Amino acid sequence: MSKHQKFYSNHSSRLQTWDYSKAGYYFVTMVVRNRRRSFGEIRDGVMHKTPLGEFAEQSWKRTTGLRPSMNIWLGDFVVMPDHFHAVLRIGVNEHNSSLSLHNELQTPGQVLFALSHPKNSFRPQSNNLASIIRGFKASVTTEARRTGVDFEWVSRYHESIIRNAGDLNFVRSYIQKNVKRWNG
C-alpha cells in the first residue's frame, strides 16, 4: 500500500469486466459537489428549475444528436436540485458491434457470459458511457461558467447496468417518483 492510499481513493467503481461501449441499458446519477442546489428547488412536490437546471435538461436532450453514431436512446430522466438521474441505452453501433450481445435487455445467462469474458484491450475512452457523461458534464459546467454560476460536479458518477426488464421498470419508477419523494 502506498503512503497515500489510506487518504485518497482513486479506484474505479466501474465493473472491471464490463465494456461500457457495449450495447445495453444504463442508469446513471451525477451529483453536484457539496450537494449544492444549483439546479433548482422542490416546492409542493414540483421541481422549479434554475436557468442552469433548465440548461442541464436541454443539454441531456441533445445527447442523441451529438452522438448519432452511438445509436443512443434516452429513457426517463429527472433534474433534481443537487443531482441528475437518467436511463439511457447504447444500441448496437459501429463502435461496439463486435462486442455486443445484440440484445436490448439481456438474460441473466448472457450477462454472466459477458461478465466472465472481459475486454482485454486498452483504448481511449470514447464512444462509450464515460464519454457521454463527460460531454454532458462539460456542457453544463461550461454554461455555469459562462453565466457566472458557482458550480462544480462531483468528479465521478454512479452507474448501474440494467440487466432485465424488471430492473428497468424499477429504475423508471424510481426516477418518476423522485421529485415527490424529495425531503431535502
PLM regions with names:
Residues 1-184:
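Short catalytic/metal-binding and nucleic-acid-binding patches
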